[in-house]
Regions:
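Beta-solenoid repeat scaffold
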Residues: 8, 32-34, 45-64, 82-84, ...
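C-terminal accessory segments
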Residues: 187-233
Length: 296
């Protein structure tokens, strides 16, 4: 077991393209290829899958498609194939984040599809389940379905600022005409800004005011034991990530002093993370703690 983990860790550190990870990955846990990524690495480019059962656990890592192809998967009776992918942020795809074709099937859990053309595309007789995922700022649609045959099961997800629409379908005989399809209210879909920490710099951790926190599938749980969040990076409900980092930008600086001042003067204390000296009060002593962090 330790040997397998070491190999997975070594592969993640020694390769920066998703294609390299794919080529160097082997079977594990019932999958033909088992890919586990390192959250501290930004992986480049997509992959093509045409046979086998593939598992990708990004552990919160970013896959930057660099305006190229995304992850595509195709299957038929002779070469069946499936993709299970979780905890991934897939960004900057010229055509799509993930595309399913033929008779392939997939499961997408806690993934972000951002700044692609289509977040997810489905063709032919594909069958895909999506939960706890975010579709935002995609140039065309969050999800695009070609023909009436694909089966989409989606719940507990968020759509936000997709330029042409969120979920659209193009059926035979329509040419290039698309029609929007509405998701049922009972699917727990959110249409709002997910409030990432730093969208432009690929920090897709959730701000503590994010509507995604504890809004995921109630049958799934985050590492802190709370109800699952929506998105690739779960929010830790039990801890302040960095003591003194009140705005959660991963830095302790004058902006945190401003936040603490607003907390004291206007009672804008958004969490117990503001009580830095743990005296159950918000006052100038907490400001002094932040200043000490900055100076030392």
């Amino acid at each position: 077991m330790y040997y397998i983990l070491y190999i997975l860790f070594f592969i993640s550190l020694s390769a920066t393209t998703l294609q390299e990870i794919y080529e160097n990955s082997g079977p594990a846990n019932g999958y033909d290829k088992y890919m586990e990524l390192n959250s501290n690495i930004i992986y480049r480019g997509g992959i093509g899958i045409f046979e086998g059962d593939i598992y990708i656990d990004c552990n919160g890592a970013v896959i930057d498609l660099e305006d190229g192809n995304g992850i595509w998967i195709y299957a038929d009776e002779q070469y069946p194939s499936s993709l299970e992918i979780k905890d991934c942020s897939i960004v900057n795809g010229l055509y799509y984040g993930v595309s399913f074709g033929g008779t392939s099937n997939g499961k997408i859990t806690n993934c972000n599809f951002l700044d692609t053309n289509f977040g997810v595309k489905m063709f032919d007789f594909t069958d895909v389940t999506i939960t706890n995922s975010i579709f935002g700022n995609n140039q065309t649609y969050g999800i695009g379905i070609y023909t009436e045959y694909p089966i989409l099961d989606i719940s507990y997800s968020l759509f936000w600022d997709n330029e042409s629409g969120d979920c659209w379908e193009s059926c035979p005989g329509w040419g290039n005409i698309w029609t929007q399809f509405e998701l049922e209210d009972n699917l727990e879909i959110i249409y709002n800004n997910p409030l990432f920490i730093d969208y432009n710099n690929f920090d897709f951790n959730l701000n503590e005011n994010s509507p995604c926190i504890n809004s995921g599938n109630p049958l799934l749980f985050d590492a802190d034991g709370s109800r699952s969040d929506i998105g690739a990076n779960s929010f830790n409900n039990s801890l302040c990530n960095i003591a003194g980092d009140l705005n959660q930008d991963n830095y302790i600086n004058v902006l945190d002093v401003v936040d603490m001042t607003n907390c004291i003067l206007f009672n804008e204390c958004e969490s117990n993370c503001f009580d830095l000296n743990e005296d159950d009060e918000y006052n100038v002593l907490d400001i002094l703690v932040i200043v000490d962090f900055i100076l030392n």
